Amino acid sequence: MLDIRLFRNEPEKVKSKIELRGDDPKVVDQVLELDEQRRELISKTEEMKAKRNKVSEEIAQKKRNKEDADDVIAEMRHLGDEIKDIDNQLNEVDNKIRDILIRIPNLINEDVPQGASDEENVEVKKWGTPRDFEFEPKAHWDLVEELKMADFERAAKVSGARFVYLTKDGALLERALMNYMLTKHTTQHGYTEMMTPQLVNADTMFGTGQLPKFEEDLFKVEKEGLYTIPTAEVPLTNFYRDEIIQPGVLPELFTAQTACFRSEAGSAGRDTRGLIRLHQFDKVEMVRIVQPEDSWDALEEMTQNAEAILEELGLPYRRVILCTGDIGFSASKTYDLEVWLPSYNDYKEISSCSNCTDFQARRANIRFKRDAASKPELVHTLNGSGLAVGRTFAAIVENYQNEDGTLTIPEALVPFMGGKTKIEKPIK
């Protein structure tokens, strides 16, 4: 959520930033108009309360003098009714302002490229060379079924479209990837591992920006009023919600592996086969909570943490900066890492790393103190995939397949696969 002082002090800047996202800048004028009404009502109620205090003193004086105070008491009641009416109006205006503010996205950083869609994202780095196959490579959705690593048909029977059973070596590979990523982040990148709730309340979803604007993308347990998490970013970032972090604690670096649940509203017809776009998938998430002056360096470091995994796994990828028309609601700047998938003959997103500046912190009321005597300030929050496990699984299957239908295990994963170096079709 944005600070209303930005609207008062720099309205044109806010308008231009909103317009860059393709949204209507008129909301700035709406906020300012309501803010002016709010100020007038506050002034009016303060005036009325001062008058009520004066009348209260007058009543006390009359009673001390044993004079008739009925007319003054009547005036006091009238003032009380007027104050109550103004307070109700003020509450209504406050709610209108908040309802607008919570739907306005974060302000985009100056170096984010302008563009209308993902086609205008800007590549800033490329690593590795896509493999030149001497045979026709298979798509991961075909190869995993041949190797008995996954069963999409039975998952559809049990749950519907966009679900999967991972079986035998498929389950082993998924677990190996999760353990490898968590080990890398905790032993080499300085993150603290967390195991988080995977059902959260509405306040938590509001804090990270999923609610109210993106409720259709979420799965909800209606009876309890809880939501399944779309990413571990949600519980990790909200760890300090409504708290003041004490001096010396920051920066906090959290990582967690969770199942993630997404309705994929608006994705009909896209990536309907395989592991790329499921309703339920595993992901290892990175979250950083830092002091404001450290957040831009933290974004670079976090992105490099995700890149280190792709490089150690030997998976070709590229880094792109998301343009103004593709960047997420809560982000001020986002890097996407896209891994090479032969079945698409293209790069597909495998990680998204964002600096949300103080946008989520204001929504979730997360503050810190620099020292014991200082005033609390809003933190900056960052999040990134480190990595999406299912998409990494798919990338390994496609990039490490062999002509005889077997699958070579990347060297970095062998210790996490119980020493297994190759996956072959099981006898039964």
Curated annotation (Swiss-Prot):
Biological role: Catalyzes the attachment of serine to tRNA(Ser). Is also able to aminoacylate tRNA(Sec) with serine, to form the misacylated tRNA L-seryl-tRNA(Sec), which will be further converted into selenocysteinyl-tRNA(Sec).
Keyword Nucleotide-binding: yes
Domain notes: Consists of two distinct domains, a catalytic core and a N-terminal extension that is involved in tRNA binding.
Protein's recorded name: Serine--tRNA ligase
GO BP terms: selenocysteine biosynthetic process; seryl-tRNA aminoacylation
Enzyme class, broadest EC rank: ligase
Gene that encodes the chain: serS
Organism: Staphylococcus epidermidis (strain ATCC 35984 / DSM 28319 / BCRC 17069 / CCUG 31568 / BM 3577 / RP62A)
Organism placement in taxonomy: Bacteria, Bacillati, Bacillota, Bacilli, Bacillales
Annotated EC: 6.1.1.11
SUPFAM superfamilies, sorted: Class II aaRS and biotin synthetases (SSF55681), tRNA-binding arm (SSF46589)
Single GO MF annotation: transferase activity
Compartments where located: Cytoplasm
Residues that bind L-serine: 231-233, 285, 385
Catalytic activity: tRNA(Ser) + L-serine + ATP = L-seryl-tRNA(Ser) + AMP + diphosphate + H(+); tRNA(Sec) + L-serine + ATP = L-seryl-tRNA(Sec) + AMP + diphosphate + H(+)
Alphabetical list of CDD domains matching this protein: SerRS_core
Record's subunit section: Homodimer. The tRNA molecule binds across the dimer.
